[in-house]
């Protein structure tokens, strides 16, 4: 499972012109599920997302986690992040999980996040979404489980 996290001052996701998820300061995470992923992969990614120290402390060092600042977590499914881009000029999506597995594991990640953190929003799995964000830094990390 891959999670491309971006530290944001605010972010929202829209489907057909309707805002379906939004957060203020926190993390926007684009999530890709791969065929070998399991619920344990999702749990491991969530642990990292909640505890990864990407927010500045009083001295300007990245020492604080999402939990430390009580920030928002916006999860957005993005199967294209799992693409194989090693050869040719067109991405191959054979390395992405089938839609049923992707949806199940994304839902697992979302439900666990809601239980453990509280300030959680999401896009809509499989939908054509427009994501708006104010990237803070920018600070972006690719986490993989």
Curated annotation (Swiss-Prot):
One of its GO terms (molecular function) is tRNA binding. It is found in: Cytoplasm. Its main location: cytoplasm. It catalyses: glycyl-tRNA(Ala) + H2O = tRNA(Ala) + glycine + H(+); a D-aminoacyl-tRNA + H2O = a tRNA + a D-alpha-amino acid + H(+). GO terms for biological process: D-amino acid catabolic process. Keywords: Cytoplasm, Hydrolase, RNA-binding, tRNA-binding. It comes from the Bacteria. The keyword Hydrolase applies. One of its GO terms (cellular component) is cytoplasm. A motif (Gly-cisPro motif, important for rejection of L-amino acids) lies at residues 137-138. The keyword Hydrolase applies. Its EC number is 3.1.1.96. Homodimer. A Gly-cisPro motif from one monomer fits into the active site of the other monomer to allow specific chiral rejection of L-amino acids. An aminoacyl-tRNA editing enzyme that deacylates mischarged D-aminoacyl-tRNAs. Also deacylates mischarged glycyl-tRNA(Ala), protecting cells against glycine mischarging by AlaRS. Acts via tRNA-based rather than protein-based catalysis; rejects L-amino acids rather than detecting D-amino acids in the active site. By recycling D-aminoacyl-tRNA to D-amino acids and free tRNA molecules, this enzyme counteracts the toxicity associated with the formation of D-aminoacyl-tRNA entities in vivo and helps enforce protein L-homochirality. PANTHER family: D-AMINOACYL-TRNA DEACYLASE 1, D-TYROSYL-TRNA TYR DEACYLASE. HAMAP family: Deacylase_Dtd (MF_00518). Belongs to the DTD family. This is D-aminoacyl-tRNA deacylase. The gene is dtd.
């Amino acid at each position: 499972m891959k999670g491309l996290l971006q530290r944001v001052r605010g972010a929202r996701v829209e489907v057909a012109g309707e805002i379906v998820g939004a957060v203020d300061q926190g993390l926007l995470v684009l999530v890709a599920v791969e065929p070998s992923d399991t619920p344990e992969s999702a749990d491991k990614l969530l642990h990292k997302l909640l505890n990864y120290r990407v927010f500045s402390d009083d001295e300007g060092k990245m020492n604080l986690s999402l939990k430390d600042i009580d920030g928002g977590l916006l999860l957005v499914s993005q199967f294209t992040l799992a693409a194989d881009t090693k050869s040719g000029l067109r991405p191959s999506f054979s390395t992405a999980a089938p839609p049923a597995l992707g949806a199940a594991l994304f839902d697992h990640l979302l439900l666990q996040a809601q239980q453990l953190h509280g300030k959680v929003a999401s896009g809509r799995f499989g939908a054509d979404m427009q994501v708006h964000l104010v990237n803070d830094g920018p600070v972006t990390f690719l986490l993989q489980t």
